[in-house]
From Swiss-Prot:
Zn(2+) binds at residues 303, 305, 308, 334. This is Queuine tRNA-ribosyltransferase. It comes from Neisseria gonorrhoeae (strain ATCC 700825 / FA 1090). Binds 1 zinc ion per subunit. Belongs to the queuine tRNA-ribosyltransferase family. Substrate binds at residues 90-94, 144, 188, 215.
Length: 371
């Protein structure tokens, strides 16, 4: 089940509500990534505390470990991981296609070796839909071929045409399995605007309830990603939610919303947190730097997260230097809280018709830098 209601537009920026089987989501929204069924360094209560509305699980990794037979015993991923809000799962395609020297691609699907034990495995649109049905994610993704940014036009066209055929197979399998959740299609086409439009027009035939923009943030220069988003954003159908996969920095989120994107996911806030890289309203802070050793201030004095309300930069510096697990947890709480705050502020700005003003102030603040 999926119902998307568009409440307000301000330029291309949108404010909406997405109703799914496990709850309602206010958009635009950022989805923390829980690759193996857990958002690294966070438990479900932490996620509730930072007001995360939906998380992402990784089909490929959960298929390999713990395996479908385990998750199925819990009625799906929600019961297995103890999370009662919506979950989106990717198709597994990105991870499989990343195994370039370990996989063989055909029209039927992709054969590859398990990086865990070397077993020969096969992933097709039908198998991906079966896995995601067992996971019982609120939003499943079609299986597609993710092409790198430097793909030639000929390669990109051939790839997107196969992804369209896989979209048709994904939808048929999803419906045959009587999956009660929602399936999104994925717009491909590499860095070619006309191919992106061709992909989008091809997907219209299948009437997916939501569409994702894939194949960005896969190694191309940032200006190229922005150029493509600038071109694709206005093409996306107004009545459906728009999801930008695997992106990105705070600035990327703001650019995406400004170009009509409703949903985002990225490992950046969690991965950077574990490496001591913290995002703040006034730029980024590297907590491992020696200058923070005696600093009594919080990460960001304007932040209301648990880490900023209770701990100093000095303590967080110490935890990071000592390799303490608590350091990774507090850093992650802060970064994900900051991302959720950005999204909430953008929702409010669109509602008030002041998104451009908010955007200008956001960039001014971020350029100022952290004291």
């Amino acid at each position: 089940m999926l119902k998307f209601t568009l409440h307000k537009k301000d330029g291309l920026a949108r404010r909406g509500t997405l109703e799914l089987n496990h709850g309602k989501i206010e958009t635009p929204v950022f989805m923390p990534v829980g690759t193996y069924g857990s958002v690294k360094a966070m438990n479900p209560q932490n996620l509730h505390d930072i007001k995360a509305q939906i998380i992402l699980g990784n089909t490929y990794h959960l298929w390999l470990r713990p395996g479908l037979e385990v998750v199925e015993q819990f009625g799906g991923l929600h019961g297995f991981i103890g999370w009662d809000k919506p979950i989106l799962t990717d198709s597994g395609g990105f991870q499989v296609f990343s195994l370039s020297d370990m996989r063989k691609l055909t029209e039927e699907g992709c054969t590859f070796k398990s990086p865990i034990n070397g077993d020969k495995l096969f992933l097709s649109p039908e198998i991906s839909m079966k896995i995601q049905t067992v996971l019982n994610s609120d939003i499943a993704m079609q299986l597609d071929e993710c092409t790198p940014g430097e793909t030639t036009r000929e390669q990109a066209r051939k790839s997107l045409q196969m992804s369209l055929r896989w979209a048709e197979r994904s939808k048929k399998a999803f419906e045959d399995l009587k999956n009660p959740n929602a399936l999104f299609g994925i717009v491909q086409g590499a860095m070619y605007e006309d191919l992106r439009e061709e992909s989008l027009r091809g997907l219209e035939e299948f009437d997916f309830p939501g569409l994702a923009v894939g194949g960005l943030s896969v190694g191309e220069p940032k200006p190229e990603m922005y150029r493509m988003l600038h071109a694709v954003g206005p093409m996306l159908p107004e009545r459906k939610p728009h999801y930008l996969m695997g992106v990105g920095t705070p600035e990327d989120l703001v650019y995406g919303v400004a170009h009509g994107i409703d949903m985002f996911d990225c490992v950046m806030p969690t991965r950077n947190a574990r490496n001591g890289w913290l995002f703040t309203r006034f730029g980024d802070l590297k907590i491992k730097n020696a200058k923070h050793k005696p600093d009594k201030r919080p990460i960001d004095e304007s932040c209301t997260c648990y880490a900023c309300q209770n701990f100093s930069r000095a303590y967080l510096h110490h935890l990071h230097r000592a390799g303490e697990i608590l350091g990774a947890q507090l850093n992650t709480i802060h970064n994900l809280h900051f991302y959720q705050v950005i999204m909430a502020e953008m929702r409010d700005a669109v509602e008030q018709g002041k998104f451009a003003d908010w955007q200008a102030q956001f960039h001014e603040n971020r350029a100022r830098g952290v004291d």
